Amino acid sequence: MIENSKLSHYKIKKIIQCFCVDIPASKTALLLNLNRNTINYWYMLFRETIYDHQTDLRAKFVGSIEVDESYFGAKRQRGFHGKLKRGRGTLKQPVFGIFERNGRVYTEIVPDCKMKTLQEVIIGKVSLESVIYSDGWRGYNGLVDVGYSKHFRVNHGANEFARGQCHINGIESFWSFCKRRLAKFNGISKEYFDYHLKETEWHWMREPNELATELWNLIR
């Protein structure tokens, strides 16, 4: 990717460093005395590379696994005049998350949070021997029937948020991190939302220097 670039390796590495600490493209252009369009090009290339890297990860999640869904955006459907509900009845975009304790996180944009939809993602990403923790949403019904014999729920509806190891605090921490990070972009178009989501997944619990080294290796 970098062989045909007019920029030196030094400059590209500087752009990567700025990208990995979430410096906006406009500020990076000023800091490095480069054209804004040049920075936009590299930032988009980085996001496409990260997206491909994250979606190509094949190893299934194993161990203690937390699953949860979250909702992003504030879009209204044209012609809809009622109040927007919160959570699972909302018009916002649902995103499903899988969190491996002390390990990786995986996110996927889903059309809904029905049982069939969530089970398809879980079956594709989580090993059967794993211990799965979820809240009480009915979309998680039936996991035992498809082979996940160790499925435990925390009942948020009864103000229960943890019972020993039975909690989903890890994935909820990721959602908070994700929404704080994405808010810095002051609005992301639907076209690019998935790229930013995977970038945030890639960022989770990692130091900028580690990210910069990996990104440099990915684009070489």
Model-found features: residue ranges?
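Residue-level recognition of single "structural anchor" positions
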Residues: 1-220
